[in-house]
């Protein structure tokens, strides 16, 4: 009996260390720890590229045909960031905007659809930092998002980013 319990404990421990644990008890696909960490890093890379208005880094986190709501393809995504930077500069000149832009993603959960396809669910908000007490931080927008991410050549990328899903 003692050996059986030890064998079971070792088997369970090893199963948790497998690079891909395909199916959970309820039938839901599970990704590996490494995949989950890589996807969380992808989400961080996304918000940093958006916050710093780095159009090349922003487009690089998407698949070549990736989309942000209705904007599709890396060239269009780069243009979106360039236009955002121009708009922010104009609003700063008129005093309508102060402080840097910060995106926050919270309550993030990763649902694996297949070994190389996951869906990330989260709540988000965009805040512009304040300069001082007279210019406090300002929340620009908030909502819920749902992104489809896929593994391409060993790297997780955003295939579609939907920051206004129906439900």
Q: Which residues does each PLM region occupy?
A:
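Bacterial N-terminal signal peptides that target proteins for export
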Residues: 1-10
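Bacterial N-terminal signal peptides
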Residues: 9-19
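Short beta-strand edge/turn micro-motifs at domain boundaries
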Residues: 117-121, 137-167
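Short, cysteine-centered beta-strand-loop-beta hairpins and adjacent loop/turn segments enriched
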Residues: 127-139
């Amino acid at each position: 009996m003692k050996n059986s319990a030890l064998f079971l404990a070792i088997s369970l421990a090893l199963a948790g260390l497998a690079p891909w644990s395909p199916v959970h008890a309820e039938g839901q696909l599970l990704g590996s720890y490494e995949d989950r960490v890589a996807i969380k890093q992808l989400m961080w890379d996304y918000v940093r590229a958006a916050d710093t208005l780095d159009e090349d880094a922003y487009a690089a986190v998407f698949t070549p045909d990736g989309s942000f709501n209705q904007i599709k393809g890396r060239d269009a995504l780069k243009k979106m960031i360039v236009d955002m930077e121009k708009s922010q500069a104009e609003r700063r000149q008129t005093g309508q905007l102060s402080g840097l832009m910060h995106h926050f993603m919270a309550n993030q959960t990763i649902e694996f659809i297949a070994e190389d396809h996951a869906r990330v669910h989260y709540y988000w908000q965009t805040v512009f930092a304040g300069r001082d007490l007279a210019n406090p931080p300002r929340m620009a927008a908030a909502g819920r998002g749902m992104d489809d991410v896929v593994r391409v050549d060993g790297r997780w990328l955003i295939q579609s980013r939907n920051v206004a899903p129906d439900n």
